[in-house]
Design a protein with these regions (language model features):
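A conserved beta-strand-to-alpha-helix junction within the catalytic ATP-binding
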Residues: 133-148
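Conserved catalytic submotifs in the C-terminal HATPase_c
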Residues: 133-137, 155, 160-170
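Acidic ATP/Mg2+-coordinating residue in the GHKL
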Residues: 217
Length: 294
């Protein structure tokens, strides 16, 4: 019961924060696991405070971004509050019902943590605090490892996986963290939007001066008029793509920023329920790190 009361109190506090009370902070308690989420949310509130004073952003873009972030915070918080109330309902008798509520609360908390992570990444990229450290890595092996980490989620959604990766080493000078971030963001994006189509594909090709990574899904796709803006951090689809399927909308902007830092290119082509493919081309040998245009 103490944890339930704490959840409700903290959820209300975060709602005050996203309405503009940036002085709000959450206090730790004896629940160690829960404290990890509290720490992340406090960091998020501080980051929102910093976002409000970043001079390099236009006022319109800044307000739009903060509006999107506020909405993305409120959505899982509303669910958390609702299910916490349900846990307190004296008519909820069965252990199964309680476990289902706890599972949903956990999933919504994970959504919050993902949003927080994206905001931190974007802030670090804006401040040029992420250094690209080049080293010869086997891009194919790192891709295989990324795929393995997503197999449980693919199985959960009943998605078929098509993989085309060279058997031999595919060495390229890339930043390990940045490359893995690109892989994870694009695979996660394909699962999120492609699960209705039940298919996901991953392809890697070694060319003379570059490696070419393609990750595709057979989901509803992206309208042609929206593709030019799909990598903008403040952009939301007219068809509420991000709102319908979840996600902050920042993942693709972060992916493009890492691709740009590698001196690479990213593109997308989309045919609804056939193939929506994101293709990343990274140079095998990197020149000096590239500054990201803000």
């Amino acid at each position: 019961l103490r944890l339930i009361r704490k959840l409700k109190s903290d959820a209300a506090a975060v709602q005050r924060a996203v309405r503009g009370n940036i002085n709000t902070r959450l206090l730790a308690n004896e629940f160690e696991t829960y404290n990890e989420l509290l720490y992340s949310i406090n960091e998020l509130i501080e980051q929102m405070d910093r976002l409000q004073v970043q001079a390099h952003r236009s006022e319109t873009a800044r307000k739009k971004l903060l509006t999107n972030i506020s909405h993305d915070i409120r959505t899982p918080l509303t669910s958390i509050i609702g299910y916490v109330d349900a846990l307190q309902d004296e008519h909820m008798d069965t252990q199964q019902e309680k476990e289902e509520c706890i599972a949903i609360i956990s999933a919504k908390a994970q959504t919050l943590k993902e949003l927080i992570d994206h905001i931190f990444q974007m802030a670090k990229l804006d401040a040029d605090e992420i250094e690209i450290r080049r080293e010869p890595l086997d891009a194919a092996e790192l891709l295989r490892e990324a795929i393995i980490s997503f197999l449980p989620e693919l199985k959960k959604h009943g998605m078929d996986l098509a993989v085309q990766i060279p058997d031999e080493k595919c060495t390229a000078e890339v930043d390990r963290y940045g490359y893995i971030r690109i892989l994870n963001n694009l695979i996660k994006n394909a699962i999120r939007y492609g699960k209705d189509g039940r298919k996901l594909g991953v392809e890697l090709e070694r060319k003379e001066t570059s490696i070419e990574l393609t990750i595709w899904d057979a989901g509803p796709g992206i309208p042609a008029n929206e593709i030019p803006r799909i990598f903008e951090r403040t952009y939301r689809s007219e068809q509420s793509r991000s709102l319908q399927y979840g996600g902050s909308g920042l993942g693709l902007a972060i992916t493009k920023a890492f691709v740009d830092k590698h001196g690479g290119r990213i593109s997308v082509v989309s045919k609804p329920y056939e193939r929506t493919a994101f293709t990343v081309s990274l140079p095998v040998r990197m020149a000096q790190p590239v500054s990201v245009k803000r």
